[in-house]
From Swiss-Prot:
Belongs to the bacterial ribosomal protein bL21 family. This protein binds to 23S rRNA in the presence of protein L20. Pfam families: Ribosomal_L21p. It comes from Nitrosospira multiformis (strain ATCC 25196 / NCIMB 11849 / C 71). It comes from the Bacteria. The keyword Secreted does not apply. GO terms for biological process: translation. This is Large ribosomal subunit protein bL21. GO terms for molecular function: rRNA binding; structural constituent of ribosome. GO terms for cellular component: cytoplasm; ribonucleoprotein complex; ribosome.
């Protein structure tokens, strides 16, 4: 059984026991997170497709960690003009583990 959820402006295919990093959600480590924006649920040949969301479906997850991704370097340069600009960015994330999918 798997589901497609939407969180943080992105879509993820999840199933029980899966660990994934999503955009930061302000919750405590070890607490339960309920995601109710479920776009699709599939159980074998039985597929429930939402328009846009599957009504009554939800995904439960446990928060494992709050952290920051590796630094992404942004570098701009104009050739022959001695213009160079460097910037870095680290995005916050929440690591979760899927504990249950309910329809």
């Amino acid at each position: 059984m798997y589901a497609v959820i939407k969180t943080g402006g992105k879509q993820y295919r999840v199933e029980n026991g899966l660990k994934l990093k999503i955009e930061q959600v302000p919750v405590e480590i070890g607490s339960e997170l309920l995601i109710d924006q479920v776009l699709m649920v599939a159980d074998g040949d039985n597929i429930s497709l939402g328009k846009p969301l599957v009504s009554g479906a939800s995904v439960k997850a446990t928060v494992l960690e709050q952290g920051r991704h590796d630094k992404v370097r942004i570098f701009k340069m104009r050739r022959r003009k001695h213009y160079r600009k460097q910037q870095g960015h680290r995005q916050n994330y929440t690591e979760i583990q899927i504990t249950g999918i309910s329809v």
